[in-house]
């Protein structure tokens, strides 16, 4: 059977190990070739091919439910559940999503994009099953560092207290998250992986006994007791934590041995109560380049399969915002030993790996634990340190209570650096950084800013590090800057709450924030071609707003446009509208940003076009909103 013939995972039933191995090779090839063209997550999926095949051969997936944590390790799952023919559209607009979506496929039982949610979701399904008297298996596959997340441990704590609730947790242990795993739990799991020689000896006892002359066959009845004794000897050193928490622990199992995996899963399904199967895998398995560089090949832009090297663009690009942030922070940290960079398992993505390499004592990676990261930062701040928490906008949502309770209420000087703010592209709605303006600006004490370009980002990094009177946040986008000149040192901090006028005109006021400043300026030039002159303000700060500058201009000009790359509801435009209303300035305001919709996976420019946020679309919308009759008369 060829992979392309599989439209339902139950077609794996009855296939031999040799046939499954052939399917495994085809999955890896399709996975590799697709990601090489489209970009996407590479290492996680390559590492779970045999795990997926072995698990699915032992389940009835018309009935049983498998919940994949995070979702980036589920590419093999997608290839086995009727999406082979469309897999070439992976992460493209209207194509197969890079993560799991309930609406995409009936075998995607729970959406995912953030880590550590699978055990909670699977346990909820198991409880619903028991309450309704239904019969199906609930399985959570968790790994790639997600077990370091507090939510996963909370779910394990709860599940272990329910000995009559059947739940299978499959721990995909590849000793990695996105970067190398950190913390006591991964260290404990690593010790368990090192116990595999004991497991190997135990599994091969029968063959060894048979080779004993004269008495080998007669010893076979004793084999079960000897194996159980070895288990008792090994479990206190290996699976003791999970056993003490109420789980039956099985493992470690070789995650690339199909025969062993199938046997293990069959045994696990027979056990009453919560079971944890510990599967040891290799991230990037089957593609040697990815195996040797598991951090670099966690996810990839399009690359050459033969060399593993990224396909170069046609022209040089300016440095990425994350790179400029990293370079600036390292320079400042070299001068100020109180600066401490904090990441939640995203050292490479945020650029803090450069700080780790240069100043390891001023760097902390807490693992996938955003809540802990923020309260850790608060603790550092109480002792006069300058904590810089560099976290993707979408992941900071997970620490909202800590932002309010531990930082803002106590008015502690924590510097939040929100990478990937705004439209992020092909990762889809779970990763869009749409909500940070709205969820942060309602909190007292916090200052919030966003740079128009990479040079202004440098000044904002200095501003954030120097701001000691309370918390401050900076949001900045994924991708490359505008190519403006950068300084190596001597950056001047900005005055808190002060904006700048970039262009003057009497017909319309455009107040732009962050990444929308450049499109706002370009839209103003297009409007000028129609005889309409705009004043353009780079707001810089959404909190506090520069009301001294913005309000008089709004009153004088009488027409206001706000631009932001974030949700309109509660966002930057709402802040402007509220300020005008509070000052009794009754002028028309049009807010351009992301409406009350989820932005699906697509290239960022495709999403911006769909949302009407390109410079030409902004100009057209301004004309339609305020100058329709005037333009019609000219035409």
From Swiss-Prot:
Family of the protein in this entry: Belongs to the transketolase family. DXPS subfamily.
Pfam families (UniProt xref): DXP_synthase_N, Transket_pyr, Transketolase_C
Endoplasmic reticulum found in the keyword field: no
Annotated Mg(2+) binding sites: 144, 174
Family matches, as NCBIfam families: dxs (TIGR00204), PRK05444.2-2 (NF003933)
EC class of the enzyme, as a word: transferase
Pathway(s) this gene product operates in, as recorded in its UniProt entry: Metabolic intermediate biosynthesis; 1-deoxy-D-xylulose 5-phosphate biosynthesis; 1-deoxy-D-xylulose 5-phosphate from D-glyceraldehyde 3-phosphate and pyruvate: step 1/1
Keyword set includes Magnesium: yes
Reported function: Catalyzes the acyloin condensation reaction between C atoms 2 and 3 of pyruvate and glyceraldehyde 3-phosphate to yield 1-deoxy-D-xylulose-5-phosphate (DXP).
SUPFAM superfamilies (alphabetical): Thiamin diphosphate-binding fold (THDP-binding), TK C-terminal domain-like
Molecular functions (GO terms): 1-deoxy-D-xylulose-5-phosphate synthase activity; magnesium ion binding; thiamine pyrophosphate binding
Name used for this protein in its record: 1-deoxy-D-xylulose-5-phosphate synthase
Domain of life: Bacteria
UniProt xrefs under HAMAP family: DXP_synth (MF_00315)
InterPro entries for the chain: Dxylulose-5-P_synthase, THDP-binding, Transketo_C/PFOR_II, Transketolase-like_Pyr-bd, Transketolase_BS, Transketolase_C, Transketolase_CS
One GO CC term, this protein: cytosol
Subunit structure: Homodimer.
Reactions catalysed: D-glyceraldehyde 3-phosphate + pyruvate + H(+) = 1-deoxy-D-xylulose 5-phosphate + CO2
Known cofactor(s): Mg(2+); thiamine diphosphate
